[in-house]
Amino acid sequence: MGSDANWQSHLVEFRAYIPLPNSNQNILALWSHNWFTLGGTPPYLLLPSAGWDEFSNTGRGYIQGKFKSNNMIYQEAEYRFRVSANGLFSGVVFVNAESFSDPVSGKYEVISPGAGLGIRMKLNKFSRTNIAIDYAWGTQPSKGFLRKSWRGFLKSVFINSTSN
């Protein structure tokens, strides 16, 4: 069993962490995660999709797999700040936008924005492992909680609370 399909894809990712002036504890985190099919037809389950990156972080504000196509562009900005003086608790505010190419034309016609906020609790200051709880909103309607831990300690879970 297997596939005779011949296809190629390329993942282009960029991350930047910018300390904000007048505060050594606040950071602006930028993330660009772009996945392109260069040739052939990939199997459906291997297509780029919302929330299908290594740690299920893309597409906050949407159910995993809500969007899927041959090509994906994802951009995110997250403001990270301390809530408690000792660093046990911190918070985040984030915005993101993702677009998937039309399967036939290959054009990017729809941009799906997302936004949210979250709280972090530090589990281990040496490994910088945090428990994270985010609440995110998306369009079409979509919103819900995302629980996760940095450093892959827990698997991400999006609990959808959409309403029509």
Where would I find each of the regions flagged by the language model?
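Short small-residue beta-strand/loop micro-motif enriched in glycine and branched aliphatics
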Residues: F100-P103, R128-N130
